[in-house]
Amino acid sequence: MVPVTASTPKPLTTPGDVVHPADSPDAPWWRDAVIYQIYPRSWADADGDGIGDLPGITARLPYLRDLGVDAVWLSPFYVSPMHDAGYDVADYRDIDPRFGTLADADAMIAQAHDLGLKVLVDLVPNHTSSEHAWFQAALAAGPGSPERDRYVFREGRGEHGELPPNNWPSVFGGQGWTRVTEADGSPGQWYLHIFDTTQPDLNWHHPEVRQEFLDILRFWCDRGVDGFRVDVAHGLVKRDGLPDWDGP
């Protein structure tokens, strides 16, 4: 988890946030908090359409408070084509219409705080949806473009680039690379996706990518979010040169 206390342009954690043992009077709240995870799509449906939503969560927060919960952790509620349960994010600054609106999110956060609950949300920084505006721009811009440099695009191996750049597998099975068709119809570069083909990996060596996620964090901090669970934090930075994988 990444705890935050203010949406100011400063580090989102400090050494003081992490050095105190859980039983210290100076320990941050999250060290011994009871955190309840909510998958928005299936947890509580307020409008009767068969899909869980943010108003449904808001209505049931008193129940969680009465259970002794200290914080709720929401799985992704962002705009998404839902190829991977919302972990394929198309817009990090908006709510998927299936779940509600930003106003619904604000109301949920306010109600949680009124009840003494903290709100944590999932952040998915390793990859975006293939429907994200950045990836669509990368496909349109072509090889060598600044737009492609936000992701992990590479030329293929083999005489005609017909083989993937390395042997990395996808967590979901098969190879971790997909070849694109360029604007002129020719077979083109390959992009890395350590998960689904619709989840292209971002290039975390790129300063624009790092800045974008700082801005996303601050966007949600400004709306009152208390912290973040960072998805695939261990996979953000890949080995230099992307060498073949030798196994565990």
Per-range role (PLM):
Residues 226:
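Receiver (REC) domain switch/active-site residues of two-component response regulators
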